[in-house]
Amino acid sequence: MEPQIENRARATCAVETTLAVIGGRWKVLIIRELFPSVKRFGELHRALQGITQKMLTQQLREMEQDGLVHRQVYLQVPPKVEYSLTPLGTTLKPILNSMHEWGTKFLEGQESAQP
């Protein structure tokens, strides 16, 4: 499957391209949930407080089209579907680690600025 970013208008810089692929409220959080292990839809839905099933489905489909997420369907009754990161998706780990470090420092700065 060809990554969806190829079908979008070319972004003018690498940061813009990254945001086009993983931007939005939910994608980075979904990726974070998939780093430790393969997850089923229900596990993701429970882990992401506030996301609707429709939005989770949409975000997973977009990430699958972009080549970040693999969707494995098992032909059984009841149907079983698992989601995991592709090798391309796992390359985002250093970015998420940096975001975690930055967020931690930011929160510490906010707390120390409180009277």
PLM region descriptions:
Residues E2, A47, Q59, F106-A113:
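Catalytic cores of transferase enzymes with a strong primary signal for eukaryotic protein kinases
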Residues L75-M99:
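Basic, amphipathic "hinge/linker" alpha-helix immediately C-terminal to the N-terminal HTH DNA-binding motif
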